[in-house]
């Protein structure tokens, strides 16, 4: 579409492309995205700290994920227009301020507002992933994206582990303070090691945002991948907040540390990321996405049949996270090939939908848990997996 111009196409490998740079981008993605998941194993701690608003604790992860979706829409497209290195450093500064506000929050309302700001500013990862796609040669793009996404998934999952341990011994407020220290250290490395990126668009900010609607209308494959990804992440997000509540009650009576330990189990899914990327590079992503959706559905069957046993939870978490990660890598490999000169904006459309799905999944999971218990949460997860499957099959019939 002419309304998306003026952009300059770019699909060549950068001279900066290296394994060490990919690992730095993976670290940036993991450390930044972890901030939107630190609160999930802390829900029982929030309930104890703010007993007058215990029924509203589900608003904290929901606010964070909605903030992330808003940040992706408002901030992530700037990567096509400005140097991503500068954008990353500016967002780290703002994120640190929001984390300090969360650590000092005197009420659940203030914590929710700080969580919203954390979500908006933690979109640093959405500069790192397109950066990897930009610097990689086309034949290695899936593997490069997979490497950075490994860091992102490890950040998501180990965030729960780290938050659980810190909260167990130092209290939940210390979790946010520790994150500030990690971000400051990361910023120092970025200043020394991360190269500048090359902007691919000269559109002013308003038109840059508006062009995303044109991209979504133009690219059928982007619409399909966005709905499929949103439904898969909704299933993923329905599970994790409820896990904390499940483990805190009978028969487990376990604290946030135990909930966090499941992050280590789930990190096994990150091992599938580079492999999924390589397979997507060689065989195409559609078959990988089909398998991934089946794994996500299977995980909730395992959760339902296990009767909420520890063994069933461990097996289900591994299956769930492998499925989610494989689907994410394959979807992103697809969308980055659709419009090389607009990768940040294409990624924004996809990831805004993705995290709106996550916010809906968090709310639906907690609501289903309160209304119908563990079985209700499992049913919600299966429903989201079914939606992902329907979207993917429909796209396949249309040749998307």
Which residues does each predicted region cover?
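Juxtamembrane intracellular "pre-TM" segments in multi-pass secondary transporters
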Residues: 7-16, 194-226
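Helix-loop-helix hairpin linking two adjacent transmembrane segments in secondary transporters
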Residues: 147-192
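Conserved MFS/SLC helix-loop-helix module at the cytosolic interface between two early adjacent transmembrane helices
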Residues: 70-108
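C-terminal transmembrane helical hairpin of 12-TM major facilitator-type secondary transporters
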Residues: 286-331
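Structural signature of the two symmetry-related core transmembrane helices
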Residues: 86-100, 287-302, 382
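Helix-to-loop junctions at the C-terminal end of transmembrane segments
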Residues: 72-83, 271-285, 369
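Intracellular juxtamembrane helix-capping segments at the cytosolic ends
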Residues: 124-136, 326-339
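Cytoplasmic helix-loop-helix junction between adjacent transmembrane helices
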Residues: 114-152
């Amino acid at each position: 579409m002419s309304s998306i111009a003026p952009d300059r196409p770019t699909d060549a490998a950068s001279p900066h492309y290296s394994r060490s740079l990919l690992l730095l981008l993976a670290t940036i993605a993991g450390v930044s995205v972890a901030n939107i998941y630190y609160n999930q194993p802390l829900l029982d701690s929030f309930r104890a700290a703010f007993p007058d608003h215990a029924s509203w604790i589900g608003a904290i992860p929901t606010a964070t994920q909605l903030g992330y979706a808003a940040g992706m829409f408002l901030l992530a497209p700037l990567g096509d227009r400005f140097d991503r290195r500068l954008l990353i450093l500016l967002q780290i500064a703002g994120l640190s301020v929001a984390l300090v506000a969360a650590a000092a929050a005197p009420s659940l309302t203030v914590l929710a507002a700080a969580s919203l700001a954390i979500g908006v500013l933690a979109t640093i990862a959405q500069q790192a992933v397109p950066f990897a796609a930009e610097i990689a040669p086309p034949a290695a793009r899936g593997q490069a994206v997979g490497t950075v996404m490994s860091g992102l998934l490890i950040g998501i999952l180990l965030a729960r582990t780290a938050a659980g341990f810190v909260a167990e011994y130092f209290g939940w407020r210390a979790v946010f303070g520790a994150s500030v220290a990690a971000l400051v250290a990361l910023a120092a490395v970025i200043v020394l090691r991360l190269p500048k990126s090359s902007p691919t668009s000269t559109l002013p900010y308003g038109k840059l945002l508006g062009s995303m609607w044109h991209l979504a209308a133009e690219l059928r494959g982007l619409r399909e991948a966005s709905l499929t990804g949103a439904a898969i992440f909704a299933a993923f997000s329905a599970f994790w907040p409820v896990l904390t509540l499940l483990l805190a009650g009978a028969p487990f009576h376990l604290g946030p540390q135990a909930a966090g330990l499941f992050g280590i189990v789930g990190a096994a899914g990150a091992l599938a990321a580079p492999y999924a990327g390589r397979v997507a590079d060689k065989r195409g992503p559609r078959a990988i996405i089909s398998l991934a959706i089946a794994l996500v559905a299977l995980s909730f069957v395992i959760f339902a049949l296990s009767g909420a046993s520890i063994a069933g939870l461990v097996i289900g978490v591994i299956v769930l996270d492998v499925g989610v990660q494989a689907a994410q890598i394959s979807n992103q490999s697809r969308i980055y090939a659709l419009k090389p000169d607009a990768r940040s904006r294409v990624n924004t459309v996809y990831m805004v939908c993705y995290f709106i799905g996550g916010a809906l999944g968090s709310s639906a999971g907690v609501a289903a848990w309160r209304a119908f218990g563990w079985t209700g949460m499992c049913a919600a997860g299966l429903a989201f997996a079914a939606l992902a499957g329907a979207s993917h099959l429909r796209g396949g019939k249309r040749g998307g």
